[in-house]
A protein has these predicted regions:
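Conserved N-terminal ligand/cofactor-binding loop architecture of enzyme catalytic domains
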Residues: 22-116, 160-230
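Short, well-ordered alpha-helical microsegments
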Residues: 15-18, 40, 139-142
Length: 230
């Protein structure tokens, strides 16, 4: 029986490195995209905790060059995406929000081109059955999601509900392709103050749509996990 392949997006939080550690004990092939600084790259290259089939280091694959406009046009047609609509989602490309560096037109397109080439290479080599990532906060994560969505590859994000300690697993950004017209059809739920207090003080849980998939973790298991990690 062939192993299922999981591609994980690993950043400085190490959240998905921990998730990879869990899946490493099961029958899965693990791959990773590393979106972090050099010190963390060095750790991942030398650690013996999780065995990855392959890791790709995002920033090591990006360097200034003249953009290939023909290639970018092919990408837009191939995946049915508007690259500028993705670029506009990233605050770092705006002078107002990024006083440290002003990106030029060609620099932005060059970055997008190299990111597309890297993502196509990663997906071609890893052929993942599904992808696990954190909250999508940068243009390149959103670009990666759009490519995966076009290719029909499930991409699951772990999203904070911003209420107590609740989290939700979603199929991409929570509000992607949001149909505002449905708001008028949705039913509001009235909660009492007692209900709200219970929700805000209860232990963290993870939800998939309306189904609870993980209940609270006991204190003994938490301590056991700490000692196992150490």
């Amino acid at each position: 029986m062939l192993k299922k392949k999981i591609l994980l997006w690993i950043d400085y939080s190490f959240l998905h490195f921990g998730i990879a550690n869990y899946f490493s004990k099961l029958n899965y092939d693990l791959f990773g995209i590393v979106d972090s600084e050099e010190s963390i790259n060095n750790f991942l290259q030398n650690q013996k905790i999780v065995s990855f089939s392959k890791l790709w280091y995002l920033y090591e694959n990006l360097s200034p060059s003249q953009p290939d406009m023909a290639y970018l046009k092919i990408i837009e047609e191939k995946y049915q995406i508007n690259l500028w609509s993705i670029i506009y989602t990233d605050r770092y490309f705006y002078n107002k929000f990024n006083p440290f560096y002003k990106f030029e037109y060609n620099e932005i397109l060059s970055l997008i081109e190299q990111e597309c080439k890297l993502f196509e290479k990663i997906l071609s080599e890893s052929e993942p059955d599904f992808i696990l990532t954190n909250t999508i906060t940068h243009h390149y994560q959103y670009l990666f999601y759009k490519i995966c969505k076009s290719k029909g590859i499930p991409l699951l994000t772990l999203e904070p509900l911003r209420f107590a300690n609740k989290w939700m697993i979603t199929n991409g950004p929570m509000y992607d392709d949001l149909d505002i017209s449905n708001f008028n059809k949705s039913k509001s739920v009235q909660l009492s103050n007692n209900d709200i207090n219970k929700l805000s003080t209860s232990s963290g849980k993870i939800y998939l749509k309306n189904k609870l998939i993980k209940t609270e973790i006991s204190k003994s298991k938490k301590f056991s996990a700490i000692f196992n990690f150490i």
